[in-house]
Amino acid sequence: MSIVMQLQDVAESTRLGPLSGEVRAGEILHLVGPNGAGKSTLLARMAGMTSGKGSIQFAGQPLEAWSATKLALHRAYLSQQQTPPFAMPVWHYLTLHQHDKTRTELLNDVAGALALDDKLGRSTNQLSGGEWQRVRLAAVVLQITPQANPAGQLLLLDEPMNSLDVAQQSALDKILSALCQQGLAIVMSSHDLNHTLRHAHRAWLLKGGKMLASGRREEVLTPANLAQAYGMNFRRLDIEGHRMLISTI
């Protein structure tokens, strides 16, 4: 797999690093760790929203060399839950994120996959928290999907499963898997270790802004590593062919 992003000694004040790593095309990378581990800080830095020590290369160029317009063509970023900036119909909000605004069928497909069909005419300020989260997810997917944006390379998601029910989480997993198969690199933070164990290709385990472990999900999500990160004991079980992590008292 080709390297999409390379991080070298990335650090921000006392909140992050220094840490190094790489993001590869066609893979799903999960950032896991307790609250305050630095996951959101790292994602914002990788998105080019903040600056600090160390270097980040994106598609072979220094991240700081990218203009905002060009960066938006090659990467999409979902920050943590935020309220709608202003009121507009959902379909209009989604269209604003499309580089090819003629692809109405793609908009409808993505909206349908996230059960937003009947929300397209509703105003963004009339949505529940879960509905707004799904609209935001649909927007970044439409921004970066190779189906309409051949330049799309990287999707960064900060706790995308927030406010989603089980069916909606499954729908998002299917979308992310399809994007990954099309060559997109996906980096997302997660608090659900079992979800990471099922769906991530690789994981970075963070604590206090430091990288405790990185590698394949099975190598990272070990009871020993998790005990170091969370200060509690874990067991890893195999149940009907599925691996599962449980905490022990």
UniProtKB/Swiss-Prot annotation:
Membrane-topology descriptor: Peripheral membrane protein
Record carries keyword ATP-binding: yes
Gene Ontology MF annotations: ABC-type vitamin B12 transporter activity; ATP binding; ATP hydrolysis activity
InterPro entries registered for this protein in UniProt: AAA+_ATPase, ABC_transporter-like_ATP-bd, ABC_transporter-like_CS, ABC_transptr_BtuD, Metal_Ion_Import_ABC, P-loop_NTPase
EC nos: 7.6.2.8
Domain ABC transporter as annotated: residue spans: 1-233
Subunit structure: The complex is composed of two ATP-binding proteins (BtuD), two transmembrane proteins (BtuC) and a solute-binding protein (BtuF).
Name this protein carries in UniProt: Vitamin B12 import ATP-binding protein BtuD
Organism field: Escherichia coli O1:K1 / APEC
Source species taxonomy: Bacteria, Pseudomonadati, Pseudomonadota, Gammaproteobacteria, Enterobacterales
